Amino acid sequence: MSKVQDASSKKTKTISKDSKSLRNTKQPHHSLPSSLGEEGMVRSFSKDIETKSLRKRLLTLANKYETSSFLNGDPSWFMHQVIGKRNQETIAFIAACLSYGSRQVFLPRIQYLLDCSRSEPYEWIKTGRYALDIPNDNQCFYRLYTNAMMCDLFHALRKMYEEYGDMENYIRNYANLQKGSKKTDAITAIEAICDHFLKHEAIGIVPKNTNSSCKRVCMFLRWMVRTDSTVDLGLWSDLIDQRSLIIPFDTHVIQQSLQLGLITSKTASMSVARKLTDKLLEIFPNDPLKADFALFGYGVNQK
């Protein structure tokens, strides 16, 4: 064999050996970041499916229960029994204030007040005629509310009507002073209502501030603001954006929301109520309180 052939043979062997070495060398593994990895994508996909499934479930329940039959045995029924925007606003607020405890007990008390007003609750308050029907004493009117407390509530409401005409206009003025805008959000409206009754020393019925969940005030605002509903009136839809409404938050809503995994806290505070509402906004972006009917329906189906 010639020297040239020998050199060529050696070179071929070297290349073959180097190729084998390269094949045996482990190549670096370029994995995706954890947030984009397969596991993360599966979790994200699963969460998306769960959200869609929950939305479908809640929407079905909401459509089933948000009907005119819902009014039967509900305090919202009273605002549908009077004529005129101011009458509806007035009896709705009074009904909301009394809506706690047993419906079999508080519904007749609301009916009593409506009867006293002869279905004209706005004038009954504004003219002070309530004083002829409700004695200013410490006798019980309903549960923790005395006659005197009810008189204080009506007196503060009368002052509001004398100065601003109605509650809607009072909140509009309050929002204008606070934010320089004649349209506002629900939390500002709640603050406005709390501030007025505290200022006029109507204590024990309307919350002093927004530290608590203000469940009954939130329910009243739902009645006044939500549109396209057979239950809610939507009288203030041009004042408050319904997307800013806060869920009326009580023990029943807490239990149902915990079971559905919407919240983790059992505290009936405004902060937890707003966190739940934020979750509901993800499901119902334009109308979070439609979910109030769904949660009610979910509770009924659990019994």
What positions do the PLM features span?
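Ser/Thr/Pro-rich low-complexity tandem-repeat tracts
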Residues: 9, 15-16
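Conserved hydrophobic ligand-interaction patch in extracellular adhesion modules
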Residues: 37
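HhH-family (HhH-GPD) DNA N-glycosylase catalytic core used in base-excision repair
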Residues: 3, 10-11, 26, 33, ...
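Short N-terminal alpha-helical targeting/association segments
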Residues: 3-5, 18
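Intrinsic-disorder-associated, low-complexity terminal segments enriched in Asp/Asn/His/Tyr and depleted
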Residues: 18, 24, 29-30
